[in-house]
Structure formats: C-alpha cells, structure tokens
Amino acid sequence: YLFVMTNRMKLLNYSFEGLPNLKKLDEIMRQHPAVKRVLEQEGAPHTLTD
C-alpha cells in the first residue's frame, strides 16, 4: 500500500524532499520486474477529473 501512496505522490508532483526513506522505497519498487509489468499494463495515469 505504501508504494501506491508514493506512486500517487509522484503523479501529484509532491516532493520527496525530507523523506529519503520513502524516495528509496519508491526507487526500489520501480526496479522490480513485476511492478514494471503492472505499471505498463495499467497504462497512462488518470485523474479523478478525467
């Protein structure tokens, strides 16, 4: 669930400044092949207003 939140932070352009552990978690998760596949399958991000 934490990766979902860091992913949302990126989509909303929130800064990871002062949150080095969250930034590292996000970077590590994005390197996993399974996570890469899921993000590819999901396609382009959408917003609540789309």
UniProtKB/Swiss-Prot annotation:
It comes from the Bacteria. Coiled coil: none annotated. Optimum pH is 6. Inhibited by Fe(2+) and DTT. Slightly inhibited by SDS and Zn(2+). Activity is slightly increased by Mn(2+). InterPro entries: Glutathione-S-Trfase_C_sf. Optimum temperature is 40 degrees Celsius. The keyword Electron transport does not apply. The keyword Transferase applies. Keywords: Transferase. It catalyses: RX + glutathione = an S-substituted glutathione + a halide anion + H(+). Its EC number is 2.5.1.18. One of its GO terms (molecular function) is glutathione transferase activity. Glutathione S-transferase, which conjugates reduced glutathione to a wide number of exogenous and endogenous hydrophobic electrophiles. Belongs to the GST superfamily. This is Glutathione S-transferase. It comes from Lactiplantibacillus plantarum.
